Design a protein with these regions (language model features):
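Glycine-rich phosphate- or other oxyanion-binding loops that anchor nucleotides, phosphorylated ligands
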Residues: 3-246
Length: 246
């Protein structure tokens, strides 16, 4: 934690964490199942805001690899958590060409393009990830400002092969033995993995550029003002949604 009032960035990949880390920013990294306890512990040390930062899958057909999405909020199946408007506006102003849109929060990877089309149609979300809804839920519980900054890695038309959706290790690094095992058993996924590797490189460069544009505190306006005036934030609302199925 960089001081008692740093911004907390929530990521899954260790690569995302390395990019996010900087002045005024601490990082929670790892599998979604471990984020809750780690984020709760970090909040106890004090924070001015929580941001979901990293890569995301594309749901809208007009988004390409490397495009930046600033979340207006995140949907789960039954709930919607809005992002802090002031922070989101700062992010949009800082990153040229960024898109302001809803994010879908899921608990399992969305691997097939047909699933992406369905999720986009059902929710209107333009991107999907597995961390934003977890971070948003905890931020809402503690009335902490929340934001989303995500870069598209796999566009809506891209199917992900089995090796690409294997769970990460606890520290946010790829489980290389499991990936190799998958490839050895299904060698026909190699061309798709090569395409994904190219997408990942493009997304990584875009994410690094966006991070540099945001500067200290990842664009959090409350971080900028902490030395000159008290932080005042409103109640973080949660909207209950009806189930889409029976």
């Amino acid at each position: 934690m960089s001081g008692p009032a740093a911004v907390i960035a929530v990521t899954s990949l260790s690569l995302e964490a390395r990019i996010a880390l900087g002045p005024g920013v601490s990082v929670i990294c790892g599998r979604a199942s471990h984020i809750v306890s780690r984020l709760q512990a970090a909040i106890e040390r004090g924070t001015l805001g929580i941001i979901s930062f990293g890569v995301a899958g594309g749901l809208a057909p007009d988004l390409a690899t490397g495009d930046c999405v600033i979340g207006s909020g995140v949907h789960t199946e039954y709930e919607r958590y809005p992002a802090d408007r002031r922070w989101s506006r700062r992010l949009l102003e800082s990153i040229p060409g960024s898109v302001h849109a809803e994010i879908a929060g899921v608990d399992a990877p969305i691997a097939q393009s047909s699933e992406k089309v369905r999720l986009h149609a059902c929710t209107g979300a333009k991107a999907v990830d597995m961390e934003s809804h977890i971070a948003a839920r905890i931020a809402a519980r503690h009335d902490i400002p929340f934001a989303i900054c995500r870069t598209i890695i796999d566009p809506a038309v891209r199917d992900l092969p089995p090796a690409a959706v294997i769970d990460l290790r606890d520290d946010g690094t790829p489980d290389v033995p499991a990936i190799l095992h998958s490839v050895m058993h299904e060698r026909n996924q190699i061309p798709a993995l090569v395409r994904i590797a190219i997408d990942a490189w493009t997304a990584r460069n875009a994410l690094l550029r966006d991070r540099q544009l945001l500067g200290a505190g990842l664009g959090c306006p409350y971080f900028d003002e902490r030395a000159s005036e008290p932080v005042r934030v409103g109640v973080f609302a949660t909207t209950q949604l009806r189930p889409t199925g029976p």
